[in-house]
Every structure is written in C-alpha cells, then in structure tokens.
C-alpha cells in the first residue's frame, strides 16, 4: 500500500531541490548597478544614505547635484557655491532635513548667494516655506508687516549694513512694501525655513530666536519615483545620457519602477512558474483543514505597505514591558507606552476584537503609511501576527488635547497656544485632503484624537475610521455612520443635508475649534438656563457676536490681540459647521482664513432648522468641483 503522505512529501522535496538549481540560472542574472546601488552608505556620523546623495565611488547611484562631502560629522553637498548640511535622513517617513551651512548660528554671512533647490528631486513639504533676507538696504526703515514677520538684523556695515529677515514674503498683502524694500537693497536671499519653527517667533522676536529657526533646518520630501522604485525592489540612480532618473532592476534599468523581466527570461521561467503554482495549490489544499488562521482577503492590502517595520507580537510585548504602562483606552483598543531598542519612546495601540472586523486596522495602517507631515502622527511600524494586531507610532509627551479642555486644565492653555493648535490641525487636515497622492478623509476628528508634543505642536492621530479616495473625487459612499456624537457632520446621518465627502471632516474641525475656545461647551449652560432642549446650538453664538461677547471662557482680562484671535476662531468654526457641505470651506481655504486677517472674515450666514426632505440650498461659493468621487476601498466591507 502506498503511503500517500510520504509520497507527497518526497515529491515536494524533489521539486524544491530542482527549483534551487533552476532559479539561479533563470532569474538571478542581476544588473550589477542594482547590486551596487541597493546598499546604503555612511557619511560622517550619518548612516543609511542613498539617492539622491552619492559618494565618489557611487556616482551612478545619485543625482549629479547631490554629491556629498563626508569629511565632517554631517553629510554636506554644494549647489553652485552654496553648501547645505544634511541634518536628518528619515527614509521611513520619507523626510530629508537640511540647513544652509553658512547660516548656522549666523544671520549675516559674507556675501551670501541666492540659490534654490531642485524641487523635482527634493520637493518642499507642507511645513516648509520661504523666508527672505534683505542686505545693504538704503530705503526707509520698515518695522512691521500686516501679513508676515519682519525683523531688522543689525549686521555690520562691511557685511550687510541695514538688513532684514522677512517671513511670508510671497503674501499678496506684502507685495507693495517688499517690492520697494527689494529695490532699495543690494542683495536678496531666499532661505527655506520651517513654518512651525517660525511660529515660535510670534512670542519671541529676538535675533537668537531667528537663529534657532534657521538652525532647525527645513524639511523636504523624497522624489516619488525613487520611493516607487525602492518599493518594486529596485535601486535608484541617474542616467547620465538621458539626464533623468533611472531605476536599476535585476534584469535591466527602467524609467520608474521594476516591471516584469524580459521576454526571454519570462519564456525560460514559464515552466518554473507553472510548477510553483501547482505546488502552491497542493499546499493550500492540504493545509486548509489543518490551520485555523486563514488570511482574510482584506489582509492582502498590507502587502502594499513598504519601508515600515513589522514587529512580532513577542517584540511588542518586549517594547511595552508586558503592557505595564497604559496611556489610554478607546473604542478601538488600548494604547501602551514603550521604548524601542534605540531608546526612542513610542506609543503602541493594541486593537481589540480583531476577529470581528479587521478593517479598522487596515484603515489605520494603510492611511498612516501614506502620510508624512509635521501635523500627522508618525507611524513607526505594526504587528500583524495571527489574530494579534498592533500599531507602533511616535510618543507625544503632552498626550491628547481633550485633557487640556477639561475644567481643571482649561486655563493652562492661553489663546495663542490654542490658536496654534487649531492652525496646526487645519494644516494636517489640509495635507490629508489635498497634499497626499490619495485623499484621506479621517471621519473622527475630536480632541481625543489630537495629540500634542512637548511644544504643543498638534498631530492628528487614530485613523481607524478613515477612508481613502482619489483626489479628483469628492463624494464617498458609506454603509454605516462613523464618528463621535457631537462631531459627526449631519450628512453622515441624513442625505437631506448633502453627500458625504471630505467636507465631513471640515464640520468636525469646526466643532473642535468651537470647543477649544469654550463656545461649544457653553451650549449646556445656555440650554439649562433657558430650560429649552430645542434651542439651536449656534443661535446663542450669533447673538453673542452681535453683542460683542466673543471671549467665551477667557473672560475680559485677555488682550485685544487675543480677543481678535478668539473671534477669528469663532467665525472659522461657524463657517465649518454650516449644515450644507456646499457652504463649508475646504481645508486649504480654512488654513488661509486662520492665517489671514480678521478684517477680511465675514460672519457666515445664520442657518435655520431645516426639516424638509429637499437638500439644503447652497449659500456660498465654497464648494469645490462637482465631479462625483468614487471610494477606493482598502478593505472588504463584508
């Protein structure tokens, strides 16, 4: 009698042995440049560098402009005669942080030149903006700008004479003043700076504060071609003949990504492919009954995640010291504090009840893996083992915003800090809606999901309810209402208000802003005082605006500037919570409103309670394109 099990085992063994001999001759004819450029290299104290940077022995592996000098602690490259230090290379988040060498702790270098960075290779991130230095100016002294920041530098006569540093030089409101200033100055130099670092000068306008802004450096993104090339197992390089990016692959160079092997290799390996398919089918058939942990169809979505660390569950237990330090609990799981082996503090979210639905995990990892922004929490890795699911992201020292909006701690944050937090959240949402290749709609914006670092820089977190859609699209189809009561847009509940879209996040943001300044919380007091449960929430906000009572929880003791900021936040919040999505501004417009002057902000139209089954009318021109947006599903809804 034939032992079928033994026969199958021996057959599989023979097949594997045969493949070990066939594969090397069939598919491992690797292009030497792919082998040469795949490893990273060290420069000074910095490790793991690759494209666009290159050292003398790796010329074909980088862009010609970015040859680095490794004689010091930091990698340094030169554009024309201008040198830049590479402060940080973060390939996980795809961020490069640079600083102009001659401006390190020096505002008045000798005859600086105006040189720009090729943004086709290293594009500016959303947090990067241009500042301008004006040197040897002969015109009248300029002390202030209505729509920006200007500071006289005090350079020596032989170096720079009467000189200035200006932020937001491209703002239309500054054009007349700066055109005159530029004409009277001998030299103008544009310097990229960090927008979030520049915000610190609002409270500290000293020259030392400007130096610190420059020393922090500015952030650039990676060339998207290189990211796609690496994801396809290629190595990034530069074609000297065509003067263009090239992806070195195992078979031959390609323009963007590694595609299929050549026809000859494909024909030679066709039989091997058929054999592999047969073996896989046999293994699947015999293993199906013997395992209880099957991969769900939606799990395959994680195969598209690249350059992310995948941790085992044992590693997660070690990182969190057996889950000994609980940071918080939510509807999707528990968050624990921990430390990576390099000492970095992290937060680890363990998703609960994964067996019932894995879409929350897929949503969060797929959404966060596509983001890289100062106001979006950084994803560092994930665990995907059996039924265990965990997400590892950066640790934020000040926790979530909601604890600072409670009665006990509300006075700890002044108007200026709350404004910076609200502006940062707006920029983060603007990035999700308009800055990513695939638009991300969060659907759960609330104080508990806004994390704060040690400088109270806000970061949007918790993407468990997020949806992805193509940028050209706007309308999402939802099979279930999602979000938190009090922050959910009305169209999520009822189609009479309009279609669900990224404008649903705008509504949640408006409720968040009103809560931050105390306007939302006062609803309870007003309703209780009037003994009416039918009063429409914004009614009393409009009444207070008409009566000039717009300081909310801050009282009358705050300064005139802070009162204007509180009123601006109120108006922006009211625009955001308009019942019809068509009447809400998009997030990029909200950022402009928050950054702009209060004088140009109009009081939004006062909505009325609308019970008709007809859609609400459009009251403003804030609506974006009318093309229908189809949802890009990242997980099965079954």
UniProtKB/Swiss-Prot annotation:
Disulfide bonds: none annotated. It catalyses: L-seryl-[protein] + ATP = O-phospho-L-seryl-[protein] + ADP + H(+); L-threonyl-[protein] + ATP = O-phospho-L-threonyl-[protein] + ADP + H(+). The chain crosses the membrane at residues 265-285. Residues 286-638 are cytoplasmic. GO terms for molecular function: ATP binding; polysaccharide binding; protein serine kinase activity; protein serine/threonine kinase activity. SMART domains: S_TKc. Glycans are attached at residues 69, 114, 136, 204, 239. Pfam families: GUB_WAK_bind, PK_Tyr_Ser-Thr, WAK_assoc. Residues 1-29 form the signal peptide. The active site is at 444 (proton acceptor). Its EC number is 2.7.11.1. Keywords: ATP-binding, Glycoprotein, Kinase, Membrane, Nucleotide-binding, Phosphoprotein, Receptor, Serine/threonine-protein kinase, Signal, Transferase, Transmembrane, Transmembrane helix. The modification Phosphothreonine is found at residue 484. It is found in: Membrane. GO terms for cellular component: membrane. Residues 30-264 are extracellular. The keyword Nucleotide-binding applies. The modification Phosphotyrosine is found at residue 393. Residues 321-609 form the Protein kinase domain. ATP binds at residues 327-335, 349. It is a single-pass type I membrane protein. Belongs to the protein kinase superfamily. Ser/Thr protein kinase family. This is LEAF RUST 10 DISEASE-RESISTANCE LOCUS RECEPTOR-LIKE PROTEIN KINASE-like 2.1. The gene is LRK10L-2.1.
């Amino acid at each position: 009698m034939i032992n079928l099990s033994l026969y199958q085992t021996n057959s599989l063994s023979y097949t594997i042995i045969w493949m070990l001999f066939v594969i090397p001759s069939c598919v491992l004819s690797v292009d030497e440049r792919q082998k040469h450029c795949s490893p990273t290299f060290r420069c000074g104290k910095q490790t793991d560098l690759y494209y666009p940077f290159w050292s003398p022995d790796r010329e074909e592996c980088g862009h010609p402009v970015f040859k680095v000098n490794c004689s010091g602690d930091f990698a340094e490259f030169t554009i024309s005669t201008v040198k830049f230090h590479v402060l940080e290379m973060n390939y996980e988040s795809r961020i490069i942080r640079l600083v102009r060498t001659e401006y390190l702790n020096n505002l008045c270098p000798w005859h600086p030149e105006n040189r720009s960075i090729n943004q086709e290779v290293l594009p500016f991130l959303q947090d990067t903006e241009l500042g301008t230095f004006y040197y040897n100016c002969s015109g009248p002294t300029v002390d202030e700008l209505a729509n920006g920041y200007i500071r006289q530098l005090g350079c020596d006569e032989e170096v720079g004479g009467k000189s200035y540093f200006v932020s937001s030089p491209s703002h239309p409101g500054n054009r007349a003043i700066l055109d005159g200033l530029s004409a009277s100055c001998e030299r103008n130099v544009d310097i990229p700076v960090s927008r979030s670092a520049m915000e610190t000068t609002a409270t500290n306008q000293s020259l030392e504060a400007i130096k610190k802004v420059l020393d922090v450096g500015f952030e650039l993104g990676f060339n998207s071609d290189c990211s796609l090339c690496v994801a396809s197992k290629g190595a990034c390089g530069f074609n000297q003949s065509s003067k263009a990016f090239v992806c070195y692959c195992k078979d031959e160079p390609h323009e963007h990504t590694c595609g299929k092997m050549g026809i000859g290799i494909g024909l030679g390996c066709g039989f091997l492919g058929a054999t592999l398919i047969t073996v896989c089918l046999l293994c699947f058939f015999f293993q199906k009954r013997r395992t209880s942990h099957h991969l769900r169809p939606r799990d395959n979505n994680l195969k598209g995640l690249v350059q992310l660390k995948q941790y085992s569950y044992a590693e997660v237990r070690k990182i969190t010291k057996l889950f000994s330090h609980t940071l918080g609990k939510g509807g999707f799981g528990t968050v624990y504090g921990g430390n990576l082996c390099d000492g970095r503090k992290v937060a680890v979210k363990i998703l609960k009840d994964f067996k019932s639905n894995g879409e929350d995990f897929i949503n969060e990892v797929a959404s966060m893996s596509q983001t890289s922004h100062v106001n979006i929490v950084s994803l560092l890795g994930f665990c995907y083992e059996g039924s265990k699911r965990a997400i590892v992201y950066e640790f934020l020292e000040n926790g979530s915003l909601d604890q600072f909006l409670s009665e006990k701690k509300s006075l700890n944050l002044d108007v200026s800090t709350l404004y910076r937090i609200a502006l940062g959240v707006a920029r983060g949402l603007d990035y999700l809606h308009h800055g990513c290749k695939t638009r991300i709609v969060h659907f759960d914006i609330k104080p508990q999901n806004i994390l704060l670092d040690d400088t109270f820089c806000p970061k949007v977190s918790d993407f468990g309810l997020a949806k992805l859609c193509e940028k050209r699209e706007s309308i999402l189809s939802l099979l279930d209402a999602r979000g938190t009561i009090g922050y959910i847009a009305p169209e999520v509940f009822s189609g009479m208000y309009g279609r669900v879209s990224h404008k649903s996040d705008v509504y949640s943001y408006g409720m968040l802003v009103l809560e931050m300044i105390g306007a939302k919380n006062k609803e309870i007091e007003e309703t209780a005082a009037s003994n009416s449960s039918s009063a429409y929430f914004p009614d009393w906000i409009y009444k207070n605006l008409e009566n000039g009572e717009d300081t909310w929880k801050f009282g009358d003791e705050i300064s005139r500037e802070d009162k204007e900021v509180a009123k601006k936040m109120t108006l922006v919040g009211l625009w955001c919570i308009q019942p019809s999505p068509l009447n809400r501004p998009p997030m990029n417009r909200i950022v402009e409103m928050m950054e702009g002057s209060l004088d140009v902000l109009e009081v939004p139209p006062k909505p009325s309670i609308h019970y008709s089954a007809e859609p609400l009318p459009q009251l403003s021109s804030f609506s974006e394109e009318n093309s229908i947006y189809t949802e890009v599903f990242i997980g099965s809804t079954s």
